[in-house]
């Protein structure tokens, strides 16, 4: 490696390749035939004369060969289609893990560009893998910068000869190829890594002096849009804080979990929507507005939100029927000083309350000074991936495991019961609200003349979750 870098600098006067800061081994390219069959045929999703949005990128856009989350990692391209009107445009994710601007352009771009037609859109986000040796190993490095430098190399393992260009030159060629088809290229900066300026920093490290800068420069040169995805998501991560950012990633500091992938997809959409006069924004779905959660708020007064299962909210409409305590707790509060909203839902566990987007609605409605009463545990002990599939791992730690869900056929990372409670607690804290965690209500189940407790399972894990983040815990 040292010999090769010396040769490149001394004989060809090009810069040394970028250092591999990710330190992640991605062997996707070891199976090119599998990769080609797993990804869509370019243009195959086209509906009539509708345009297609093509996504070109690496594992942060499509993790692994299949991109199905079977290792707990997801790329943001998987969720991008959720934001577009599929009756007017389709989204094809052609990204592939392990590719750099150089390897994607040489090996996969010819197949993608074949399917591009006039009026289509192509988002290009590459650079995470433009590092390492020029002529050995994965041999995927591009020359740093946007210059016209080139380097003739012979791949040591195969004897194949190749001319290597700068990162900017590869991006320039992507853009020009798309323009030649009458389509519209958009350059994106890289997704941010879980990398902070230093151990005490609250600032996510940007790529605005390297790949982000170079992509922006090429966009300006070629007069095409540039969207700084790196900065949009990094700004969100900084508001989240380090603990929350940890689970935006899975297994390493570059590949996102489903949580992180959704944030990146949302950021990409925001960048498109907010870019002045970008026609692609016209194909986005309208932003949904929740006009119900938080609607009881009175000016200058907090809201008490309750979340949980059927013991918190049931039918609650028949004096002789079943009621949840969240529907009667209003009576003990001064309605002139506070309002109460019961957001619980029967049959939900902590996990399914989150998965169904119910917590997101509460989270979005929270304001500083609000309260959140959190009570789960009755429905959390069932099957994890079959039947109702609402159980979690036992305990309150950070353990997690990937499961294949029988009903949906999709992979999902499932965490411990306590992990979900800690997420609710920290999310509330992030918004300036006050979370209060309650152990679940007792059942009409007796032993030796006493009501049975769950003090060694869900009661214990609830207490541990609250104590882990120093928040109030009440034993119901």
Q: How would you describe each model-predicted region?
A:
Residues 1-4, 472-475:
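Conserved small/polar residues in nucleotide/adenosyl-binding loops
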Residues 22-95, 111-122, 141-143, 294-345, ...:
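Serine-esterase "nucleophile elbow" of acetyl-processing enzymes
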Residues 59-63, 96-102, 128-133, 191-195, ...:
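Solvent-exposed loop/turn segments at secondary-structure junctions
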Residues 192-229, 442-474:
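Substrate-gating cap/lid alpha-helix
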């Amino acid at each position: 490696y040292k010999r090769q870098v010396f040769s490149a600098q001394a004989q060809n006067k090009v810069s040394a390749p970028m250092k591999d800061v990710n330190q992640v081994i991605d062997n996707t390219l070891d199976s090119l035939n599998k990769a080609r069959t797993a990804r869509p045929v370019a243009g195959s999703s086209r509906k009539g004369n509708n345009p297609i949005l093509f996504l070109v990128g690496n594992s942060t856009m499509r993790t692994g060969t299949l991109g199905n989350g079977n290792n707990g990692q997801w790329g943001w391209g998987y969720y991008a289609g959720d934001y577009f009107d599929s009756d007017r445009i389709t989204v094809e994710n052609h990204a592939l893990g392990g590719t750099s601007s150089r390897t994607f352009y040489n090996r996969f771009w010819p197949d993608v560009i074949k399917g591009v037609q006039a009026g289509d859109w192509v988002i290009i986000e590459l650079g995470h893998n433009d590092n390492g040796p020029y002529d050995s190993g994965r041999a995927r490095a591009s020359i740093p910068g946007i210059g016209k430098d080139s380097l003739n190399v012979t791949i040591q393992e195969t004897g194949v000869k190749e001319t290597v260009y700068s990162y900017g030159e590869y991006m320039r060629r992507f853009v020009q190829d798309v323009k030649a088809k009458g389509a519209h290229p958009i350059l994106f900066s890289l997704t941010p890594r879980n990398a902070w300026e230093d151990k005490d920093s609250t600032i996510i490290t940007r790529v605005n002096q390297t790949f982000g800068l170079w992509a922006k420069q090429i966009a300006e040169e070629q007069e095409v849009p540039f969207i700084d995805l790196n900065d949009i998501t990094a700004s969100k991560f900084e508001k989240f804080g380090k603990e929350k950012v940890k689970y935006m990633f899975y297994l390493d500091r570059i590949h996102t979990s489903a949580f992180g992938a959704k944030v990146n997809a949302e950021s990409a959409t925001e960048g498109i929507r907010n870019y002045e006069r970008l026609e692609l924004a016209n194909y986005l779905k309208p932003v949904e507005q929740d006009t119900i959660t938080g609607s009881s708020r009175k000016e200058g007064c907090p809201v008490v939100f309750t979340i949980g299962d059927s013991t918190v909210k049931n039918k609650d409409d028949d004096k002789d029927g079943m009621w949840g305590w969240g529907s009667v707790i209003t009576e003990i509060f001064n309605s002139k000083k506070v309002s109460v909203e019961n957001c619980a839902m029967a049959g939900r566990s902590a996990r399914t309350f989150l998965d169904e987007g119910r917590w997101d609605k509460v989270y979005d409605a929270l304001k500083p000074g609000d309260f959140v009463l959190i009570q789960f545990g009755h429905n959390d002990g069932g099957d994890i991936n079959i039947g109702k599939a609402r159980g979690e791992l036992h305990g309150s730690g950070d353990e997690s495991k990937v499961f294949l869900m029988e009903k949906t056929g999709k992979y999902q990372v499932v965490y411990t019961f306590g992990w979900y409670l800690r997420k609710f607690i920290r999310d509330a804290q992030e918004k300036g609200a006050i979370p209060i965690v309650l152990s679940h209500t007792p059942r009409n189940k007796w032993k030796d003349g006493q009501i049975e407790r769950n003090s060694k399972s869900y009661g214990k894990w609830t207490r541990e979750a609250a104590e882990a983040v120093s928040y109030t815990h009440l034993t119901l």
